[in-house]
């Protein structure tokens, strides 16, 4: 991954070709729509933050074959909820089959990667330490 920008608050690098779209910042109860993010990412793939709060980040992650998943371990715990598609999520060597409706927890610092997908859309929920 080469860096063209950094994700807010985490020091994570944004791959070249990805763009930051302003996310909704919530400090009180709020609702948010992920439809626009899903539509923007459907063809090209990528990650877009849709909600930020002091303790949480929510994003939409779309993987389109043959582009590989370039993730590196993160400093925060995260949960993936598969919205569309199927594949394999490998966490620290353990392979988990994922499909629409599957959720998976990845602890901070864990090596993890999606493989075996054609088109995979995932809701990503990061804690902020």
Give residue ranges: language-model regions:
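Structural motif
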Residues: 53, 91-93
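Short acidic-glycine-tyrosine-enriched beta hairpin
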Residues: 93-108
């Amino acid at each position: 991954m080469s860096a063209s920008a950094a994700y807010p608050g985490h020091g994570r690098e944004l791959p070249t070709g990805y763009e930051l779209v302003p996310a909704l910042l919530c400090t009180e109860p709020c609702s948010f729509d992920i439809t626009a993010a899903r539509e923007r990412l459907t063809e090209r793939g990528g990650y877009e933050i849709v909600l930020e709060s002091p303790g949480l980040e929510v994003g939409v992650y779309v993987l389109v074959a043959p582009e590989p998943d370039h993730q590196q371990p993160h400093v925060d715990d995260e949960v993936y909820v598969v919205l569309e598609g199927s594949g394999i999520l490998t966490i620290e060597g353990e392979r988990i089959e994922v499909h629409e409706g599957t959720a998976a927890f990845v602890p901070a610092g864990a090596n993890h990667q999606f493989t075996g997908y054609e088109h995979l859309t995932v809701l990503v929920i990061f804690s902020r330490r």
